Amino acid sequence: MELKDYYAIMGVKPTDDLKTIKTAYRRLARKYHPDVSKEPNAEARFKEVAEAWEVLSDEQRRAEYDQLWQHRNDPQFNRQFQQHEGQPYNAEDFDDIFSSIFGQHGRHSHHRHAARGHDIEIEVAVFLEETLEEHQRTISYSVPVYNAFGLVEREIPKTLNVKIPAGVSNGQRIRLKGQGTPGENGGPNGDLWLVIHIAPHPLFDIVNQDLEVVLPLAPWEAALGAKVSVPTLKERILLTIPPGSQAGQRLRIKGKGLASKKHTGDLYAIIKIVMPPKPDEKTAALWQQLADAQSSFDPRQQWGKA
C-alpha cells in the first residue's frame, strides 16, 4: 500500500496555508470535473484531487497525514503500514490507519475544520457631489453557493441598504462584515467589500483632495481683470480675476475641494484664454490698434533673436 503525496497531487507545498490549498483544489476540480474535462484520465484525477482535499482541508487529518509522511521511510512504520496492503485506501480510512500505527495517544479527537467564507467585492459608482455628505445607497449583488467540489452551484441574489460616508475617495474600500459567502462547518461568513469608484465629472478633475476646473477667459478679461462666476460642487461663486492674468495660471479657491476626516481640499481655477471668432472689419481695426500700442511686446522673446 503506497502513501500518496497529497501535496504533489494538489500542486502545493507542505508549508502552504489552507487558502492556497483551497485555491489549488478549486482550480483542479474545475479542470478535471468529468462534466467539463475532455482529458482521458479526468475522472481518476478528479477523484484523486478530491481525496487529497478531504485530508488537507481538515486541520486534524492534515496533521496526522504530515506525521505519516514524515515516518514513511522508517522500517517500523513500513512494516505496520504494509499490514493495510490490499485494503481500499482513501481519506476516510485515515483515522484507522493512523490509530493502528501510532495508537490513540498520537492523535486528538477528530473534528472538521471550520473555514471562513469568501469575501465578495463589488464596485460602487459615486458622483463627486455625493462625496460631500453621507448618503444611503441600495445595492444588489449575488452570493455564490459552492458545492462539495468547489464549483459554484447557484447564486443567491441579495439587496442591502448601506451608508456611504462623506469624503469617500476613489478606490476606497468599505467593509460590510459577514455579508460575503457563508462559512463552512460553523466558520464565520466572509465580508462584502464596497470598492468606491468616483464617476468622471464633466467639469472637475481630482488631484488628491483638491479639484481643478478650467476657467475660460476672454483676452480682455485676462488683461484688464474681471469678476466671473465659477462653479463649485455646491454652488457658483464670484471669483476676482487679477489684471494681467496669464494662460495656465492657477487661482486658488480655498476650502472648495473634497472633504475628508482630516481636512478639506481646495478648488483651483486654471485660466484658459479663449479667442473670439474671426474678427469683422471693425474688430480687426481694434486689434490692430492694440498691436500698434504693444509693438515692443514680443511673446517669443525667450527664443532669442532670429
From Swiss-Prot:
Looking up PANTHER family in the UniProt record yields: DNAJ HOMOLOG 1, MITOCHONDRIAL-RELATED
Q: Looking at the keywords, is Signal present?
A: no
Provide the protein name. Answer: Curved DNA-binding protein
Gene coding for it: cbpA
Domain of life (superkingdom): Bacteria
Give the location in the cell: Cytoplasm, Nucleoid
Which terms are listed as keywords in the entry? Chaperone, Cytoplasm, DNA-binding
Read off the PROSITE patterns from this record. DNAJ_1, DNAJ_2
Q: Which SMART domains match?
A: DnaJ
Q: Which GO terms describe its cellular component?
A: cytoplasm; nucleoid
Its source organism is Salmonella choleraesuis (strain SC-B67)
Which HAMAP family does its entry note? Answer: CbpA
